[in-house]
Amino acid sequence: MQVLILGSGVVGVTSAYYLATQGHEVTVVDRREAPAMETSYGNAGQVSFGFSSPWAAPGIPRKALKWMFQEHAPLKIQPKRDPAMARFMMAMFNNCTPERYAVNKERMVRVAEYSRQCIDALRRDTGIRYEDRQRGLLQLFRHESQVEAAGKDMRVLSECGVRHRLLGAEELVTAEPALARVPGKFVGGLHLPDDQTGDCHLFTQRLAEHCREHLGVTFRFGVDVQRIERQAGRVERVVTSAGSLRADAYVVCLGSFSPLLVKDLDIRLPIYPVKGYSLTLPVTDDGGAPQSTVMDETFKVAISRFDDRIRVGGTAELASYDLSLLEKRRATISMVVRDVFPEGGDAAKAEFWTGLRPMTPDSTPIIGATRYDNLWLNTGHGTLGWTMSCGSAHLLADLMAGRRPAIDPIGLDVSRYAA
C-alpha cells in the first residue's frame, strides 16, 4: 500500500517508521526543510508515560481565573476575538469533572504506557540514540495540598500498573541529588522511575535518516500542503506547492494545523494551538544539574537533562497561531530553573524557543479512521507528542493494516466528539 504522510514532526516520522516496517511504501511531505523543525524542535524533553495527565482537571476553571492575575502563572490567555479559542476553553472546562478526568486519564495512560514499550523496542531495533536517559521523572510539590491532590493520580497509576512512589522532602535527593542544594523548598514529590528523557528533535531526525536508509521511506521537504480533494467518499489526491500527490492511504500528522486542512472535508477537529516556551542552557556544574526530568507542579515547568544541556519547558499560552517570543514568558521559566537548580546551567547563554502544542479539550490524542475510508488521523497530542509518538504510530499502523492492535483503540478516534 502506498501511504502519504502529511507532516514530519515526531508523530509523522514515527508513523512512517511503523508503516514502513509493515511493508508499506511511505512518502512524507513537510513544508519545512528538515524533520522536526516546528513543535518537535524544542519541547521540554520529557518522555513522561506515567505523568500523562489531562489539563482538564477538577478545579482548573477556578485556578485559571486566579492565574490571570499572577506574574508567573502556568496559563496565560491573550485577549483576542477568537471564536475557536472560546469553543476550546468551554469544551475543556466541560471536561473538568472528576468523572471526565478519570476517563481521559485512563485513555492517556493507555497510549503512553504502550508508547513506553514501543520506544524501548525501537531503540533496541534501530540502535539510534538521542541524548536519552532512562532515569525516571520527579514531580515536585511545594505545598501539602499538591501532595494530597496527587492521591487521585496515584490511584489511576496503580490501576494502570504504572510504577510510582511518593517521596517525602528528605527523600527527594535519592532521585535528584542536586536538590540537596535547595533544602526546604519542596515538601515532597512523586517519583515515576520508568519515565525517560531525550532530545525529541534529535530522535526524529535520526529516525527519519534510518527510515530513508533502511526502510525506503521518501521524504519531500519544502512542500506546502494546500488542500485535500475527495471523490465518492475517498480522498483522491493532496494538492501541494509541488503539484498533486496521490496514494492509497493518507495520514494527517500536522499538529495544530490539522484542523485547518480537514475542515473543508467536513471533519471538525477540536484542536487548538497552545503555545509553549523553552530554554536550552549549557550545563555548568554537573553536580548542580538535574540527572533526568523534574516537573515543578506549581509552575507546570519541566526541567530535563540532555548530555551537556538542560532543557526547561513550560507555560501554556492561548494566543492562536502567534509565534512571537515574549520576554515575560522567558522570565517565568528562567525563574523556575534558577530556583530549582541555581548552579546547574548558564541562563545567560540560553536559547529561547516557542512552539504550538496541538491540544484537544480532553487532552487525549486523535488516532484512527475518519469518514473517508482512506484518510487517517494521528494528531492532537498536546504536550505529550514526544511521550505518545511511538505508541500512537504503532497503533495507527496496526489499524490501517486491519490488524488487532496491542491496546484498545476505543475512545481515541475523532468519533468521540460526535455526540
From Swiss-Prot:
Gene Ontology biological-process annotations: D-alanine catabolic process
Domain of life: Bacteria
Entry GO terms, CC: cytoplasm; plasma membrane
Family matches, as Pfam families: DAO
Entry keyword set: FAD, Flavoprotein, Oxidoreductase
Record family assignment: Belongs to the DadA oxidoreductase family.
Protein name per its UniProtKB record: D-amino acid dehydrogenase
Species of origin: Chromohalobacter salexigens (strain ATCC BAA-138 / DSM 3043 / CIP 106854 / NCIMB 13768 / 1H11)
Lineage: Bacteria, Pseudomonadati, Pseudomonadota, Gammaproteobacteria, Oceanospirillales
